[in-house]
Each structure stands twice: as structure tokens, then as C-alpha cells.
Amino acid sequence: MKQKFDVTGMSCSACSAHVEKAVSRVPGVDQVQVNLLQNSMVVEYEDGATDAAAIIHAVEDAGYGASVKDAHEPAKKAENDLQKRTAEEAKKMKHRLGWSIAFLIVLMYISMGHMLGWPLPGILLGHENMMTFALTQLFLTLPIMYLNRKYYENGFKSLFHGAPNMDTLVAMGSTAAFVYSVSRLYVMGYAMGRGETDMAHMAAMNLYFESAAMILTLVTIGKYMESRSKNRTSDAITKLVDLAPKTALVVRNGRETEIPADQVQVGETVIVKPGQGIPVDGVILEGTGTVDESAITGESIPVEKKAGDRVTGATVNRAGYFQMKADRIGEDTTLSQIIRLVEEAGGSKAPIAKLADKVSGIFVPVVITIAVITIIVWLLSGATFSFALASGIAVLVISCPCALGLATPTAIMVGTGRGAEQGILIKSGESLETAHLVDTVVLDKTGTITEGHPAVAAVRTAPGVTEAELLGLAASLEKASEHPLAEAIVRYAEEAGVEVSQATEFAAEAGQGVSGMVSGRKVLAGNQKMMDAQKVTLDGMDAEAGKLSEEGRTVLYIAADQKLLGMIAVADPVKKTSAEAIREMEQMGLDVVMLTGDHEKTARAIQKQLGISRVIAQVLPQDKEREVRRLQEEGHKVAMVGDGINDAPALARAVVGIAIGAGTDVAIESADIVLMKSDLLDVVTAVQLSRAVIRNIKENLFWAFCYNAIGIPLAAGVFYPLLNWQLSPMFGSAAMSFSSVFVVCNALRLKGFQPGFRKKHGGKTTAVPAEEKKGELTMKKTIKIEGMMCSHCTGRVDKALNALDGVTATVSLEDKAAYVTVDGAVTDEELKKAVVDAGYEVTGIE
């Protein structure tokens, strides 16, 4: 069972490490992850072996508070509540800080002003007023200590529980300075009572009230700055929450009624007008709209929607009017799921953080030990007690476990948030880290490299067979199949007006094709392997099939009663950005491998068109996982990119599984990274983002370790004998505050992350990239065509364009366009002439 808890009282990584350690000791707990940034904890435990009450008890015994987070609370509401709590805490801290600074300014003026020649009231000057001078500092320090008493409460409480943290260091440092100063007050009183002015003067010069106050104030300043910076790390989640419309227009009792969006019920009819945000997920019942989905997918071009199309909550209807049926509300909406994914990813730990976690767990006890040793060594070496104490206090307050603890989670939080803004959902910190290790990317062809919407490109009949007969039998058989190629054949036949009947005894042979009975005839539709197995003679058609395969078509032979009737060639257009994405991957040093069930010749045609380094053809759906495993056994770190149900095992097997956004729920569930758009360039972005985040984490960890490695010896006075350097407690506390702020600010640089290809094109991608492979220049173009009315029209245009040397074309009736790949010798005029000669009008070539 997996349960999320809110945890209170944590102030640094030592706290989170102790909470994690305490809960992991509870019998039945399998895994614990504590998030210092979100003050939350996720626990996986065996139901029956333990329960939430035992876990909360363990946290309380460790000196902190915990409560179960409501699993049914919508992510948007939870995030809003977190924002309110954070804002309230920031307001209190700001109030506390303001008064602390006010008292500190007066204290510093009095304690240091006489050294700088600044004017002081007469009652604070002279030997006879030394006690007044000291007591004034005491009374100015006490309010600062009271305002910041939280450090003492948390610090000493943690110390007594055997889990000292950063608050413990601050509390011990400021208390030591305060107690020593109070002891100097007694010495002053004793000396003045005996008339020993020099002794009293020496005691007055060794007061550290301003150090005690300065430590508390500077640490609070640092905490305030750190808090504000940390809040910015979750800006992406805040933006997502703000996307959701607050109200919805629904039809109740036949009337339009405006209600809060969270009160919409499943099955209700929701009205969406131009310019309005869509409040929930659902399906359009009537009307049309132009929907801006950029907030969810990152795609800037609005999408036309009509009856039957799905729409997503938090997207915006830019134009049009429609009514929709709500089918996903509250925590089930796409937006809520995205928020939950981003939160969970930000709260997860990357393996690179393990060293920092180990160090954080023992850091504070080690620092306290070093501080005690520092005082003892200086006293034994003959230094004054005030010098030794100042060095010990400096060690306590300069040490910063927070920098270590924040190094990884801040970078992961900002990185996953930045990914979400670009339509890339990263499920965990481990996935984010692992992606930077990838050296091989395996791409499923259909729906990943290609559009996933095949269309019939050519029909060839055997002698004595009509096209209508061939299409009728093929479509009747394929209608029982759910394969994309089958859908293309059925659609083509229906558009041609061919009668489609019902097939019986339907059977599918994996990797070969399908068979069944149509109008009393045994019909086969499949590849050459199926024809050979069924002993169907190809009558020389295999030569033409080979030519079509070399052009990137997938060829299906159609036979009836063991006699070949003809063949149908189907083409799946390559996505416009696939070539550029593959080129970018290769430039990043990644090996690109394409998996496809197509014939070898078809696969080689796609390989040549896109410049893919390696192709594995005729792969059965169940064998994709085996191919990924084989690559891993060769020593490769493999990322698998796919969108189908049969991709799920391969996605799970890969080091990183990437589900492309148009894919199935099963594929998305199996993946580590989900791309909301069906764009391969987002794979490039995901890998580059991973590399940027890991680089940022390494910078943070390097800073945190180096800061403590240099700062602690400096504070202890190691360099004093040689260079006469001694760090005062005030500078130590300032340095500690700066250290945490530096780490958070460095992580915030990731908010400006842009993938390399966007930088090249000024923040935009090239929609139709040109490519140069092995000295041969090829270009991909889109020809907009008017006048095509049916599948016969597309066939004529297809034939006209493919008759040109150096041209490979796929024609889409739905898009009223032809997608062509041409070599540099073919001009736009030649393309236009071919279409016009076929009897159609060209409205544009892109």
C-alpha cells in the first residue's frame, strides 16, 4: 500500500533524513521518501503488517508531526492549500524578520559604534557606565531571541531526540554566545564591585550579544530568501493549477446554469463558448471549436474539434461554440493527473542524491564534535577562552547541511516542472537521472516515426480480377481487424463505394496477416510469408511488390481460395519533425534503432528517407521486448519510444520507457516519461533536459561539499597560525545563509532551459526539415491540393507524383494534401505541373 503524509517541523536535510530513518524502522514498511521542499512523505508498506497510525507515531517519536494526506483530495485543491500555508508561513517569517532587523540595527550601533567613533548617549560611555552598556545589549538581544525561539524549540528538541539538525547548530551557536556574554556580565559586576576597572573593561570587550543576535537574524534572512526561492521551484505546478477555470456553464433542467467547476458531475452537458476555458475532460456532443491545447501539450497551433472528438480540461476554446459531455472530473481529469505526476516526480529521489543523504544523516553530530574539538585544541594551545569559543561557535554556524539536502530536490523539482511546461511528464527523479545515461534510442515505427494513420497508396489486380472485387473481399475481411492498415483498406473501399460484407471464421496470424470466410470464399490478406505458408503463387507480382516496398509502402497480398487476386499498398506518412529529431539524436551521440513489423525493403526505404543508423524489420509485436533486451545485453543503455499496447513490455524493459502522447493508457502506464505531443523532437528535449538537470545537481553538490570542506576548517582557525585568518561567528552565519540560497538559485536557472534545436531556430522548430545524408540532399514538402473528392482522385495524384524521378509521395484525402520527399533536382514547378496535369489545383507548396 502506498500512502502520502504531510510532515511538520522539518527545517533541513538532517530532519528529513531522521524522519526517513525513523519510519523505515517500522515493521512492514518497504520504502520511504521524504520531501523537504514539500514537507511531505510517501510510504510504501504492507497492509496488515502496519498502518498509518504506527507511521505517524514513529514520526512523532522522532520529534516531528505527521498527518495522512487525503488521497481523494483533488490535486488542484491540495496545491492551493499548500500555497495558502506557504504564503501564511512566509508572512509570519517576514514579520519576525522585520522586528529582528530593527532590534539588531540598534544593538549593532551600540556594540560597535564606539569603535567607529559614532556618537552614543552619555549613559553608555565611560568606565562607570560599563554595566549599563552591557545590560542594554542584553535587553536588545532578548527580543531577537524570543522572536526566533523556533530555532531553540526545534533545535534542542531534535538534539534530545538524538537527531540534531541545522536548527540545533544555530541554537547551540547563539546560546553559547549568549551564555558566555551573560557570564561576562557577572565578571563585570564582580570586578566593578572590587574596583578592578581593567578586569571589568576586559569583560566588556568580550561580550558576544551582537553575535548571538546576528546569527539568528542572518539565518532568518537566509531562510526567508531560501523560502521565496524554493516557492519558485514549484512555479510550474502553480501555473498548472491556475489553468483550471473556476466556473463552468452546464445545462440543468433545460437551462444554462453557471456553477463552480469542481461541482460538475460525470455525464452532465457542459457549454463552452468562444474564449472560454474548458472546465473538465469530455467528448463534444454538438458544435465545433478551435481549441488551444498548448497549456497541456505544449503545441502552439490550435486544433479543430467537432462532434465525437475528445477535449481536455484547462485547454481554451479560441473560436466556435460546442456542447460537451463531462466524463472525467476532479482528480480524474488530465490536468489533475499531470499535477500529481509533477508533484510525485518532484518529491522523488534520484540515485545521485544517495551520497548527500548519507552525509546529511551524520553531518550535524560530526560538526558538533568538530566544534568541541576546536575549542579544546585552542585552549590547549594557549589561546584565550573567548578566542576558542568564538572559533567553536563559528564552526557551528557556518556548517550547512541544508545546501547538501537541497542540491538534488530543487533541481529535480524545477526540471520536472520545466518539462511539464513543454508537454513532457517525467514520472520520477530516477527516470530523470537515468535518461542522461541513454546511448541508444529504439523507435517503434507506426505512430512514433509515422503519423499512425495509414492510407491506401496503390491497388494492383491480377489478370481477370476487378478492383471492386479485390477491394470488396479485402475490406470485408479486414473490417474484423483493429490493425491500422486494416482501417485504411476499409476506409478506402467505403470511399470508393464498394460493398463491404461480414466476414466469418476470422483469424489473425501474428507477423503474417489475417484470414476468414467472405461470401463462401476463403480469403487471405497478408505478407509474402503468409502466401508462402498457404502455398499461394504470386505470379510475378512480387517484383512490383518489391518496388513498392522500396518506396516505403507496406504491401498486402489478397488471395481467395488459394488464388492471388492482387495486392494493396498502404503508406503511413512520416511525421514532419521525425527527420530533424533523428538527426538531433545522432548529433547528441545517440544510436537510433527503428523497430518495425514491415518487410525488410519497406523498412530500408524509411531508413534511407530518414537516415536512421539501424533498422530491425519484421519484428513481431511480442518480440519488441526481446530486441530491447538484446541491445541491453550488448552493453547499451536503451530508451524505448512507443505508443501501442504491444509496446508496453518493451517500454518496461528499457532503461527509460518513453510513451508518445497519442498512445494508449497501457503504454503510458508502463513508461517512465510521457510525451503529451506526438512529436519525436520531445524525445530530444527530454534527454537534453535530463542532462541539464544532472549537470545542475552535480554543480550543487560540488558547491555544497566544497563550501563545507573549506568553510569548516576556516571557521575552526586552521589557517590562523599561517595566515592570521579567523572567521567571526557573524560572518559564519552569513556564509551559511548564502550557501543555501546559492544552491536554490542555481537550480532556478533550469527554468530557462531550452533544447538545442530550439536555440538553433530561434525558439522554433523547422516544420519541414531539409536533410543531407551521404552527400545526397533530400527535402520533404507538403503540397496543398483542391479538387480531390474520393479515393480514385488520390490514386491519380499519387500516380502522377510518384511517376516523377526522385519523388516519393503519399496523398491524403482527409488533409487535401500530398506529402512528398524529393531530391534537390526536382523543382516546385515540376511538382505543381504533375498535379495540374492529373486534373487538380495546387493551392500551395510548403
List the predicted regions and their residue ranges.
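Actuator/coupling domain of P-type ATPases
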Residues: 61-69, 74-76, 80-81, 135-137, ...
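P-type ATPase nucleotide-binding
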Residues: 456, 460-588, 600, 612-628
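Membrane-embedded alpha-helical bundles of multi-pass transporters
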Residues: 116-131, 160, 179, 418, ...
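Conserved catalytic phosphorylation-site environment of P-type ATPases
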Residues: 296, 355, 390, 403-477, ...
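Conserved ATP-binding TGD loop and adjacent catalytic N/P-domain core of P-type ATPases
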Residues: 17, 348, 438, 518-520, ...
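Flexible metal-binding regulatory segments at protein termini and peripheral loops
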Residues: 1-132, 144, 230, 255-256, ...
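Soluble-to-membrane junctions at the N-terminal ends of transmembrane alpha-helices
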Residues: 81-103, 154-177, 339-371, 388, ...
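Conserved cytosolic catalytic loops of P-type ATPases
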Residues: 27-46, 53, 206-209, 238-332, ...
